[in-house]
Amino acid sequence: MWYFLRDTLYSIVFIGVGMRTSGKLWIGKSAGEVIQGENSFDIIRYFLSFAVLVGHFRVITGIPYYFPMSSVDAVHGFFILSGFLVFYSYMRNPDIRHYTERRTRRILPPYVFIVTLCWMGGVLVSTLPVGEYLFSAQLWKYIAANYSFLNFIEPALPGCFQGEAVNGSLWTMKVEILLYITVPIVYYLMKKYRPFPVFIVIFIFSTLYNELFYYLNEKTGNEIFGILKRQVGGQLLYFYSGTLVLLCFDYFRRYIKFLFPVAVLVCYFRYDVPLLIYVEPLAFAVVLIGCAYYIKWFVFMRKFGNVAYGIYLFHFPVIQFSIWLGINEKSHILCFAFCVVGTLLLSVLSWLLLEKPILSNRVFSSK
């Protein structure tokens, strides 16, 4: 235990002092080996995506399906993985143009696809006549709001799904984009002022942000404060917890056998033991990235395209469509199977026909 505490203290001091070699921000040497080599990030993405799918299926249909992780935790998990992988990607090539192009190619095509599919498909499920639907002010408000990632302005389509949100998963996209925007800024600040003080400022700010809007929500009962709590200020904790593990990866790898069970206990008892909730983001990052590092059974999945992003984007409207068809009234199991198969089918088609060609530079190439 003494050696662990000693070396952990050394690692904190090491990061606090900072290390600049050839003008590059320091990173754990083994992090690159794990990211580019054998890891199970793909299966973790699938697990998180299905956690969100099951969570939304349960809420929308009222059918009590169980999954070992809540949709809220799954969203936090996605932010952690982004903080680890996206920050690493930027550190390898800190060119703004390259970074922007890579992020745009990854997130924009399937997003535009599902928004377009929803408002065009709305013609078929809307209770309004086609002409009234197409010239509805609500439709054009939906189109403008959703193409600009401001989904909260108009989440519903005219006459569709009894006025409920068409795709309740899209709210995280604007948060994800804003987190991406912070990466070059934080990278610059870490190079200038060293990582440790920058992490401290980020974690303190995000914690205070969460506490403020949690208090206001509890005090006033106004849900707007709960919504604000979930925005980018509150998610910085999770995103940069992933980044912190990245920068400390050599130490993380050395002490994973001790850190992992401690992190699991922190996550499990976070609501029961005071103060644990404040270190839960970092503990969750240790658990997720530890699983990616240690679980080798699913390494083979790296050979195939990952459609987890598609599952996340497409499942919500598929669930709404299944309700519109009335499948849930006939069989809960059939309804769930329809949602899973329909979501997977859309995700695979999107990957093969849209995402993969764009990512491989076969379309929209800048060359």
Pin down the residues of each PLM region.
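Alpha-helical transmembrane segments of multi-pass integral membrane proteins
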Residues: 3-18, 264-356
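Interfacial loop-to-helix transition and helix-capping segments at the boundaries
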Residues: 2-11, 36-39, 64-75, 161-175, ...
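Juxtamembrane transmembrane-helix termini
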Residues: 20-27, 71-106, 110-133, 318, ...
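Solvent-exposed interhelical
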Residues: 177-206, 246-258, 328-332
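Membrane-interface helix-loop-helix regions
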Residues: 112-175, 284-287, 291
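Short, Lys/Arg-rich, polar N-terminal cytosolic tail immediately upstream
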Residues: 1-2, 17-37
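Aromatic-anchored segments of alpha-helical transmembrane domains
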Residues: 50-58, 202-215, 262-273, 314-321
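Functionally critical transmembrane alpha-helices in membrane proteins and complexes, commonly lining
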Residues: 11-14, 18-20, 36-91, 108-111, ...
